[in-house]
């Protein structure tokens, strides 16, 4: 009888220990999730920045990678990628290097095509059009004979100029992940077509699907901050072996090269 009571007591202690341990793990995981969200929120707070020249006066994260006196360079990049069945993958993107030292900005508008040749080897073709920014306007630095293309470049807007994540904390059922070995971290959310940012993308791009996208926010490097790390957003509308439709955007602060 005494042996039976001791056995029951031991079992209760074991169950209690497991329960306490599980609670501790859950608390630790929740703490890491919170840290990841806080890290992303620092970047997302930059959206929207309607006037790109405001980046001349915006300070980013600095570490030992920066030379003394280097104010740093903001790199903004937006890209729309469409690959339909039995068609070439085509992307149209623009990247700007916003130099805080010289208060000048230059970059490229890039048209990229990817396809497989008759032997199944991947082939690609990039066409770059150099640009500069003055008074928040994109200006091609070389003559472009194609009026439609020239207007597309001059009227280009980066996602940071119109995207808005003020409701990011209301996004539900996010899948937060962290890999300490890289380190890398991400947060993924299923959006609806009524989402503000989705509406803005559809307004500006010909997106050949009615499917609502998933939003993936990902980064790498030290969670506390790193100029070596990289963060970007990805709105994936379609992703399979035959078709891919997605939009990517990034804002990163780096030492000036």
From Swiss-Prot:
Q: Which UniProt keywords apply?
A: Cell membrane, Lipoprotein, Membrane, Palmitate, Signal
Q: What is its main location?
A: membrane
Q: Where is the lipid attached (S-diacylglycerol cysteine)?
A: 23
Q: Which Pfam families match?
A: DUF576 (PF04507)
Q: One Gene Ontology cellular component annotation? A: plasma membrane
Tell where it localizes.
Cell membrane
Q: Cite the positions of N-palmitoyl cysteine lipidation.
A: 23
- Record membrane topology: Lipid-anchor
The record lists the membrane-crossing segments as none
- Write down the NCBIfam families for this protein, in alphabetical order: SA_tandem_lipo (TIGR01742)
Family of this protein: Belongs to the staphylococcal tandem lipoprotein family.
Protein name per UniProt: Uncharacterized lipoprotein SAR2573
- Origin organism is Staphylococcus aureus (strain MRSA252)
